[in-house]
Amino acid sequence: MAPALLLVPAALASFVLAFGTGVEFVRFTSLRPLLGGIPESGGPDARHGWLAALQDRSILASLAWDLCLLLLFVVQHSLMATEAVKAWTSRYFGVLQRSLYVACTALALQLVMRYWEATPRGPVLWEARAEPWATWVPLLCFVLHVVSWLLIFSILLVFDYAELMGLKQVYYHVLGLGEPLSLKSPRALRLFSHLRHPVCVELLTVLWVVPTLGTDRLLLALLFTLYLGLAHGLDQQDLRYLRSQLQRKLQLLSRPQDGEAE
């Protein structure tokens, strides 16, 4: 019972940290660019052009710092997902391997958000300034962000979020049920090996669909787009499995309604 008393709080702490980081990530990627307004040192008249920005050391230093933060997150997220590192962490942390990975990812993302340096004086790729675009573009972006985040949360529920967060591994271990992934079908394991980030399109929508796309936001969107693109490798078998699982879940959801109709 003693190990369980240590394992469960550790897994729950990792989950709480990841949940809080997710809430902060929503603020960082959506609320701040959509509702935060123009920074005090920014504005159309204070911004440099692209050529002038390349000669401004403060802008280049901020972008270089942001790039280092993003690379830190990418290296951590990718390195800890390799088989060698997973084997090492499993040897020393056992069933908490996934929880450790989630906690380290959350901490790396917290570093990115906390120490991110905006470039309000930098050039913009696009900006909705003139009416009616200044009114309708932010509203459209807000709607798309809300829909995207709702889809992201829905997909995480479908994709066994308890296993993704490391909670299910500890729960199964305490009950003596073994490893959760060992109970999944080969088709499901194949899909999970190809798609551990099941929110690619929705996250890209959040990153790119903003009223003003400045240089620091462009850097954030570009690097995450490249990373998400390289991290996915779905093929026709995976798509057929996803389609069959979706149809199965829809049938399960429709059964109570059919019973009530009778």
From Swiss-Prot:
Membrane side Nuclear: residue ranges: 1-4, 81-97, 165-191, 235-262
Classification via InterPro entries: Nurim-like
GO cellular component terms attached to this protein's record: nuclear envelope; nuclear inner membrane; nuclear membrane
Residue stretches spanning the membrane: 5-28, 59-80, 98-114, 134-164, 192-210, 217-234
Perinuclear space-side segments: 29-58, 115-133, 211-216
Membrane topology: Multi-pass membrane protein
PANTHER family: NURIM
Protein name: Nurim
Native species: Rattus norvegicus
Lineage summary: Eukaryota, Metazoa, Chordata, Craniata, Vertebrata
Gene: Nrm
